[in-house]
Amino acid sequence: MAGKELKQCQQQADEVTEIMLNNFDKVLERHGKLAELEQRSDQLLDMSSAFSKTTKTLAQQKRWENIRCRVYLGLAVAVGLLIILIVLLVVFLPSGGDSSKP
């Protein structure tokens, strides 16, 4: 009887050992996956930083482009108004000649 109980205890100990080894393998596998996830998250962080820098640079370029466009438009309007003013002055101001004297 003692031999049977000893055999049963040994079998249970072997089962526990096998379960513990399986758990250890799972822990190692999980550690590998966590390391991979950490590496991927670091890469994503680097990529997001680069993206943020690029968007700030692009926004600044677009802002200056918009300002430049407004300046050109303002200059075009000013030149157009100046031309209209010169034409009106030439047409409506009396000329230096005495064409109105009898």
Curated annotation (Swiss-Prot):
GO terms for biological process: cell differentiation; Golgi to plasma membrane protein transport; skeletal muscle tissue development. Preferentially expressed in the skeletal muscle and heart, detected at lower levels in several other tissues but not in the brain. Pfam families: Synaptobrevin. Its main location: membrane. Residues 5-65 form the v-SNARE coiled-coil homology domain. It is found in: Cell membrane; Endomembrane system; Golgi apparatus, trans-Golgi network membrane. Residues 94-102 are vesicular. PROSITE patterns: SYNAPTOBREVIN (PS00417), V_SNARE (PS50892). Belongs to the synaptobrevin family. This is Vesicle-associated membrane protein 5. It comes from Mus musculus (Mouse). The gene is Vamp5.
